[in-house]
Regions:
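Internal, well-ordered alpha/beta segment that forms a basic, Gly-enriched binding/recognition surface
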Residues: 1-31, 48
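Acyl-donor binding region in acyl/amide transferases
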Residues: 1-8, 29, 55, 113-178
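Conserved catalytic-core motifs of GNAT/GCN5-like acyltransferases
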Residues: 15-16, 177-190
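Short, well-ordered beta-strand micro-motif
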Residues: 17-19, 96-98, 185
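A conserved beta-strand-loop-helix scaffold within acyl/acetyltransferase catalytic domains
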Residues: 23-131, 140, 145-146
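Positions that flank functional sites
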Residues: 58, 161, 186
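Short secondary-structure transition/capping segments
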Residues: 62-65, 166-168, 191-194
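Flexible glycine/acidic-rich beta-alpha junction loops that bind and position SAM and/or redox cofactors
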Residues: 128, 164, 184-193
Length: 194
């Protein structure tokens, strides 16, 4: 879309953003997060755990599994015949949720740059109750990890025009808000003549 197009002037760049708290533990506080807390407690009862993935071979194995799950998703809305995830290996922050038996349930890959982070990949690795609960559990895990890194904003760069209703509902439930981002050049102020 050209920057001077009518649609650009009308919408700017609209995207979902989660403003992160400054203090650890603050994300799940408040009445608006009651359902999120309930889902996290259920995930804990199911024995869901998480770990940060730093081993390159394990990352490649998880990427292979993620691509396979995208190609074979039972819901055509979420199925991606040719996943484009090779860039994930370029990013440092990899988190995985695991079932009580050790199976990977969800993969989260998030590029971080100062106070900003981009939700590049946040998908379940299979289908079922464990995977569903892992989404909520891992949202809190990701937020807490990002807060520890000094991140203030988590951006979901998904195309809002084509976002499935299930993902839109999940974003609202976890605290994402649609914001309009204006992209522009920094203007340098002229220094006074001496």
């Amino acid at each position: 879309m050209r920057r001077n197009s009518s649609l650009w002037r009308l919408t700017g760049l609209a995207t979902a953003v989660l403003r992160l708290p400054e203090e650890p533990g603050a994300y799940v506080l408040g009445a608006s997060k009651q359902t999120l807390r309930r889902k996290i407690r259920l995930a804990n009862r199911l024995g869901i755990s998480w770990e940060e993935v730093e081993d390159e071979q394990e990352r490649r194995d998880l990427l292979k599994l993620a691509n396979s799950c995208e190609r074979s998703h039972p819901d055509a809305t979420y199925r991606i015949p040719v996943p484009g995830n090779d860039d994930l290996l370029d990013y440092r922050l990899w988190l995985v949720a695991r079932a009580a038996d050790g199976r990977p349930l969800l993969l989260s890959v998030t590029p971080v740059d100062g106070e900003l982070a981009m939700l590049r990949y946040f998908r379940t690795l299979g289908w079922g109750e464990d995977q569903s609960q892992a989404r909520y559990f891992m949202t809190e895990v990701l937020v807490e990890r990002l807060v520890s890194l000094g991140v203030r904003y988590l951006i979901d760069g998904s195309n809002l025009f084509w976002l499935p209703n299930g993902v839109r509902h999940f974003q609202q439930m976890t605290g994402f808000h649609i914001v309009r981002v204006r992209v522009g050049r920094l203007r340098r102020r002229a220094l006074p003549a001496t």
